[in-house]
């Protein structure tokens, strides 16, 4: 017989009745029923109920053993009586009558309960993560993560992609977030950087003659944390040669659709090809470049209904040509109480308020200050244009859309959530396309790159030479699911002349480009194929599939929101000897 087990704790069935077995695992729960002790024994695979009688050798050990101690038992599989069968367990038709028991590892008093999964402070959960990971939900999430990565890898290989690894120690890059720097002992005063993404290396692989690359790549960014962002994360890094934007979409859509169908527990997934929404349309309709399409609300520009009179405040705002009035429909939100709550919410968001019109049963028509000023005829025309009628409401935001669009998008989300318009039981995908190549900086009084400086502008060099920078759009795209940006991608700028001109428009001379990106630029001078790619985030994909709201719930050993590893006590101080070897002298910040 094997030293520790003949079966796992999730394996035994009624067909095993009468078998002599050996099991090892954790004491999940212990119950004393009139002399007989019942133990739920747990391992990675499941639970098995044990029955220990006073005559069993080691019974006194079992009486005093704590939860989460590790034990080994020998015993016989017996069928449970009909009234004690547990239909919720795969092993629920049997139990093991223990003949011998040995404690392999006794547990101390637990700082964190495993059974029952009560809510517990995150700092305790992270400090004792090995206990937290024993809890069913988190354990299942980490298994799901492994399965999702296996599925992604299989689907990519089936499409002819090859998996390569790129360097972890690389050069610091000026674009994007802050780098994590690693001092070089062999080269004093110089530093490596941990990669924010394998961006330049994957492009160099295409220049090297490879055609389809992927990698489950670790990435590191020294940036502010939030629920769906971490200092270290993994992404499905992808690059392809001789492709258009459509080719990239056609390659990745079956992977995303397949993975979400496989692990989405029956929730409908957007069929591919996924909808494509131009960036400016997404901002105008949803107030966001990562819209949640489960929310049916679409905002509309209703400036013409207010221009020149009616509601004086909006009319005055519209005298400035750059301003607009946007409407946020609120189907079935037609009550003063709901409108007042929305107005209070807006004030809590730092806004002066939120204009509204609502259906008033008392008046038998539209109510609210805006309706009163517009008059019945204009108000009726406005609400009909929004597709609204009895029982509905509409909310209004006025000013410069560049300033208010994020707030308008948040109001759309708030209305959809509070009115329960969002279908939680589905995965809605879309592409956001046609991102602006450049944006004007009022602070610096110049154009700069809106997003990725290495994207190919639509129209290439001709567009850069003959269009206003603010009108140029890039072959850049994001994939969005349920309001979460899963990745960004682009068709790359593989031509040195186009790249240098793009950087020139953004205020960077050729000497700066050569200094900071000379390696890649020089490679492009030796024959570079048109290429493009993207990089969906593994953590966010698993978070959505697991139904979690924070990526820490799908990472085995995450950092907390202050960027600390409470289990391993990182970051930590290092010895003076280590600093000396690296030629580093510390200059701590002076406390005020």
From Swiss-Prot:
Protein's GO biological process: aspartyl-tRNA aminoacylation
Aspartate: region residues: 199-202
GO terms for cellular component: cytoplasm
GO molecular function: aspartate-tRNA ligase activity; aspartate-tRNA(Asn) ligase activity; ATP binding; nucleic acid binding
Keywords linked to the UniProt accession: Aminoacyl-tRNA synthetase, ATP-binding, Cytoplasm, Ligase, Nucleotide-binding, Protein biosynthesis
Chain residues that bind L-aspartate: 175, 221, 451, 492
Cross-referenced PROSITE patterns: AA_TRNA_LIGASE_II
Binding site residues for ATP: 221-223, 485, 537-540
Reactions mediated catalytically: tRNA(Asx) + L-aspartate + ATP = L-aspartyl-tRNA(Asx) + AMP + diphosphate
Any Pfam family the entry gives: GAD
Enzyme Commission identifier(s): 6.1.1.23
Enzyme class, first EC level, given as a word: ligase
Cellular localization per UniProt: Cytoplasm
InterPro entries according to UniProt: Aa-tRNA-synt_II (IPR004364), aa-tRNA-synth_II (IPR006195), aa-tRNA-synth_II/BPL/LPL (IPR045864), Asp-tRNA-ligase_1 (IPR004524), Asp-tRNA-ligase_1_N (IPR047089), Asp/Asn-tRNA-synth_IIb (IPR002312), AspRS_core (IPR047090), GAD-like_sf (IPR004115)
Site features described as Important for tRNA non-discrimination, chain residue numbers: 33
Family membership noted in the UniProt record: Belongs to the class-II aminoacyl-tRNA synthetase family. Type 1 subfamily.
Chain's role: Aspartyl-tRNA synthetase with relaxed tRNA specificity since it is able to aspartylate not only its cognate tRNA(Asp) but also tRNA(Asn). Reaction proceeds in two steps: L-aspartate is first activated by ATP to form Asp-AMP and then transferred to the acceptor end of tRNA(Asp/Asn).
Assembly behavior: Homodimer.
Protein name: Aspartate--tRNA(Asp/Asn) ligase
Organism: Phenylobacterium zucineum (strain HLK1)
């Amino acid at each position: 017989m094997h030293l520790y087990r003949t079966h796992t704790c999730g394996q035994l069935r009624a067909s095993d009745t009468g078998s002599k077995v050996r099991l090892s695992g954790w004491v999940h729960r212990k119950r004393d029923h009139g002399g007989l002790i019942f133990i739920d024994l747990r391992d990675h695979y499941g639970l098995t109920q044990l029955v220990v009688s006073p005559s069993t050798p080691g019974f006194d050990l079992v009486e005093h053993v704590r939860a989460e101690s590790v034990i080994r038992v020998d015993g016989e599989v017996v069928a449970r009586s009909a009234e004690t069968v547990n239909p919720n367990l795969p092993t629920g038709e049997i139990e093991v009558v223990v003949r011998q028991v040995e404690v392999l590892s006794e547990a101390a008093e637990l700082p964190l309960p495993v059974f029952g999964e009560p809510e517990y402070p995150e700092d305790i959960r992270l400090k004792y993560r090995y206990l937290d990971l024993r809890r069913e939900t988190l354990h299942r999430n980490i298994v799901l993560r492994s399965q999702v990565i296996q599925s992604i890898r299989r689907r990519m290989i089936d499409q002819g992609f090859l998996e390569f690894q790129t360097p972890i120690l690389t050069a610091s890059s000026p674009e994007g977030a802050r780098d994590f720097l690693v001092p070089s002992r062999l080269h004093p005063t110089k530093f490596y950087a941990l990669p924010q993404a394998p961006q330049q290396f994957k492009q160099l692989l295409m220049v090297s003659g490879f055609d389809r690359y992927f990698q489950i790549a670790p990435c590191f960014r020294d940036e502010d944390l939030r629920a769906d962002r971490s200092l270290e994360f993994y992404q499905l890094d992808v690059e392809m040669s001789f492709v258009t934007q459509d080719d990239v979409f056609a390659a990745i859509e079956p992977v995303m659709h397949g993975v979400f169908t496989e692990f989405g527990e029956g929730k409908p997934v957007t069929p591919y090809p996924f909808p494509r929404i131009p960036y400016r349309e997404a901002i105008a309709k949803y107030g966001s470049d990562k819209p949640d399409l489960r929310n049916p609300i679409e905002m509309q520009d209703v400036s013409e209904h207010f221009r020149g009179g009616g509601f004086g405040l909006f009319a005055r705002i519209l005298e400035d040509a750059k301003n607009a009035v946007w409407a946020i429909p609120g189907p079935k939100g037609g009550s003063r109480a709901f409108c007042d709550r929305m107005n209070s919410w807006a004030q809590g968001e730092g806004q002066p308020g939120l204009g509204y019109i609502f259906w008033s049963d008392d008046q038998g028509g539209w109510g609210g200050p805006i309706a009163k000023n517009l008059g019945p005829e204009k108000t009726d025309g406005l609400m009909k244009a929004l597709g609204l009628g009895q029982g509905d409401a509409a909310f209004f935001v006025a000013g410069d859309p560049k300033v208010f669009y994020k707030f308008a998008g948040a109001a759309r989300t708030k209305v959809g959530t509070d009115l329960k318009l969002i279908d939680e039981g589905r995965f809605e995908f879309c592409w956001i396309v046609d991102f602006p190549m450049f944006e004007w900086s009022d602070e610096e009084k110049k154009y700069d790159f809106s997003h990725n400086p290495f994207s190919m502008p639509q129209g290439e060099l001709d567009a850069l030479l003959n269009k206003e920078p603010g009108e140029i759009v890039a072959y850049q795209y994001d994939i969005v699911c349920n309001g979460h940006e899963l990745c960004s991608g682009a068709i790359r700028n593989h031509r040195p002349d186009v790249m240098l001109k793009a950087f020139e428009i953004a205020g960077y001379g050729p000497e700066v480009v050569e200094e900071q990106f000379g390696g890649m630029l020089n490679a492009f001078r030796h024959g570079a194929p048109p290429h493009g790619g993207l990089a969906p985030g593994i953590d966010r994909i698993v978070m959505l599939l697991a139904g979690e709201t924070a990526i820490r719930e799908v990472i085995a050993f995450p950092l907390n929101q202050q960027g600390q590893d409470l289990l391993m006590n990182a970051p930590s101080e290092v010895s003076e000897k280590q600093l000396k070897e690296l030629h580093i002298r510390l200059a701590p910040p002076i406390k005020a």
